[in-house]
């Protein structure tokens, strides 16, 4: 069986590599036509998608899948239309492929510049949400790449139905159907093969729980674009506008609880703590957020649960917030350096010199001033859809959109130039 899986995955890899060469040559018009055709196919086959999805939902209920996962798994008319519109929006985005920058003459007379080109073959491993099949395929195609998609077994039928629409759209536009391939087996050995296919796969993007991403990172020989945790911080400086600070800190925690850009730890300068924490605590309680605090915090909020050492390094993804009162900016930056996952941090301040220092010294993929961490999102950043968020420093960092799925090569223009 292992040999069969290896042979199957090698076939997918070879087909993807061949398709990637064709996609790299495809012009913007053909890629956009494919995206529109894919969107049309999703809406035309909405009935087929819902029937396939019903099988997945039935299996999920039989296997006692968590209600939240069942909700993510469900496809209805609204979500199918949303997927289709997402593809059309990606078609409307600028095509990064072929863009040339920094073209300049050198003393030798040659011109040297950089051209943006596709990465090649992208392996995407994800869980639960079948819409990722369409989103990931579209981003890979618009950026001139081929994709091998391995979704969760709980969405097997839905993913296959969406992939059929994607391939139909590619073929309508005259592009290779093998540019997007879905791993059809549920055997986990297929993932083990995919993450080690260096000869065919250029980069992996895992999307899912921490356990999945840790496994991929530990076992892959192919480079990985990923983030493990979203331990995001908001620091309220003593120069902050109290009303503004309360509003932002409340939004950063409560606007949506289970996302990687939700604030998990609130740091407050001791000089402003009495002016913001009682009101902020009241608002958190109204939203049924559990408060965990240091000793100084609990003197202002007596019903707060004592925070443990582990709380400062925990991504709750739940209605829980840790609060620590610190002497000032130095201690806030030090706390973030020790406990942050490198995702997103924000300072609330009216002192621009402190804001600039925070921007310069905090080493995370997104650093903000007077804004909610919930803005750390490809759409909000003007990137359009994103394939994920990277907290690594190589190759991409922060929300990864179309440009993050490309790289650069040097181009040199001459006219018979030789090196003396």
From Swiss-Prot:
CDD domains: ALDH_F18-19_ProA-GPR. One of its GO terms (molecular function) is NADP binding. It catalyses: L-glutamate 5-semialdehyde + phosphate + NADP(+) = L-glutamyl 5-phosphate + NADPH + H(+). Its EC number is 1.2.1.41. It comes from the Bacteria. InterPro entries: Ald_DH/histidinol_DH, Ald_DH_C, Ald_DH_N, Aldehyde_DH_dom, G-glutamylP_reductase_CS, Glu-5-SA_DH, GPR_dom. Pathway: Amino-acid biosynthesis; L-proline biosynthesis; L-glutamate 5-semialdehyde from L-glutamate: step 2/2. Gene3D superfamilies: Aldehyde Dehydrogenase, Chain A, domain 1, Aldehyde Dehydrogenase, Chain A, domain 2. GO terms for cellular component: cytoplasm. It is found in: Cytoplasm. Transmembrane segments: none annotated. Its main location: cytoplasm. The keyword Amino-acid biosynthesis applies. GO terms for biological process: L-proline biosynthetic process. The keyword Glycoprotein does not apply. Keywords: Amino-acid biosynthesis, Cytoplasm, NADP, Oxidoreductase, Proline biosynthesis. Belongs to the gamma-glutamyl phosphate reductase family. Catalyzes the NADPH-dependent reduction of L-glutamate 5-phosphate into L-glutamate 5-semialdehyde and phosphate. The product spontaneously undergoes cyclization to form 1-pyrroline-5-carboxylate. This is Gamma-glutamyl phosphate reductase. The lineage of its organism: Bacteria, Pseudomonadati, Pseudomonadota, Gammaproteobacteria, Chromatiales. The gene is proA.
